[in-house]
């Protein structure tokens, strides 16, 4: 369920997913919670070598370091062409999967310990349900190109400039991943999504910092990621739900 295409790095997100995937059996989670299916969704990572090839083969090296607007960058990348091997893999993947997909950035600098780059680059959600395979391939290709382009958007350049890193050194891998969830009427989403932390910096009552904290919400968890309203609870004390103003 975890595959890579190309040489180079998997990027921050890709490395984390690969590490978790290889450690799944060692953790013994399935034995401890047999009634719950725990796993990593089917994933394909386009390594940074494919990004470099796309930039070079489409002669984009000059515009990415220019003062071009985000719109101009997006159009330049959308006009680019993929290598045949990339298109073959996309076709093979979508021939097997007609399930919603997340096309996620996974740059070299992303998910670093002290400079996480959260929300700096683009992610796209694709319904991937069009009856015409060619349309789905086109939509996937456009999403990948726009993730590539977001490496050089003004927001990303400004963020990188505030760090010891250089935009010239940045490389982008792309994670293509099945979305976990189910159909609910005309919508598709998981029952819950969230973020778990091993340390709770604001314990209440008898809850200890080491008990951790989970922030969860209905659906894909966007409200969690963007700091909006959600439920925060310690997994060790699931019935004690202490909510704060934010």
Language-model-detected regions and their locations in the chain:
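Conserved mixed alpha/beta core segments that line enzyme active sites in large multi-domain catalysts
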Residues: 1-32, 80-246
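A conserved helix-loop-beta module that forms one wall/lid of the active-site cleft
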Residues: 1-66, 70-81
């Amino acid at each position: 369920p975890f595959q890579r295409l190309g040489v180079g790095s998997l990027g921050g997100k890709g490395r984390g997913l690969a590490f978790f995937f290889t450690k799944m059996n060692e953790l013994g989670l399935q034995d401890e919670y047999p009634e719950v299916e725990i796993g990593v969704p089917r994933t394909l990572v386009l390594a940074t070598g494919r990004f470099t090839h796309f930039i070079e083969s489409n002669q984009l090296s000059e515009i990415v370091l220019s003062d071009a607007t985000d719109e101009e960058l997006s159009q330049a990348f959308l006009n680019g062409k993929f290598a045949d091997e990339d298109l073959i893999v996309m076709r093979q993947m979508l021939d097997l999967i007609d399930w919603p997909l997340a096309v996620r950035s996974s740059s070299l600098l992303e998910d670093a310990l002290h400079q996480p780059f959260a929300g700096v680059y683009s992610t796209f959600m694709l319904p991937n349900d069009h009856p015409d395979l060619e349309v789905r391939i086109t939509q996937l290709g456009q999403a990948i190109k726009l993730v590539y382009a977001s490496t050089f958007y003004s927001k990303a350049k400004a963020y990188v400039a505030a760090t010891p890193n250089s935009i010239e050194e940045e490389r982008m891998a792309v994670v293509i991943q099945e979305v976990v969830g189910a159909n609910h009427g005309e919508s598709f989403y998981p029952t819950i999504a969230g973020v778990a932390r091993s340390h709770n910096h604001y314990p209440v009552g008898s809850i200890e910092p080491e008990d951790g904290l989970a922030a969860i919400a209905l659906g894909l968890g966007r409200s969690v990621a963007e700091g909006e309203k959600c439920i925060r609870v310690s997994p060790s004390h699931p019935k004690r739900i202490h909510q704060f103003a934010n």
